């Protein structure tokens, strides 16, 4: 974190480093969050992969309350979609491609909102892609739970139909996947 902050001083843009939740992003042992926060980390995430271990996520959220920083989680429950490559739905079925169900995202969001509720921590949903997930965050916020989210423009502008229309281009493969319009 210190290295990134030092290099950022030479740049014309503001850089706000995000530290790892777990050591080496392995999802097993909590990283030295307090040390990274002292160095300037503004949040913590293992993005690219979810913090799958609920106990680890709970501890991270507990620490986040002391450090007053959010925990950003990539919301996919991996055991629900081990072989999926796109949204589970009519397009995936038509193309014969294993799908990733929307519930894999929604289940992880619900879990982390509950953990934020009991710890008082701030959970941030990275690149939300389901209407149900957005509703879960909206409801959590109205209940006073520290939950926020962001969405990528491609999840707003495209649906899983783009996978087929692109001729299965790798440009349409992402996590979470492009979802259906419904």
Listing of model-derived features with the role each one plays in the protein:
Residues 20-26:
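Active-site beta->alpha loop and helix N-cap motifs at the rims of alpha/beta catalytic domains
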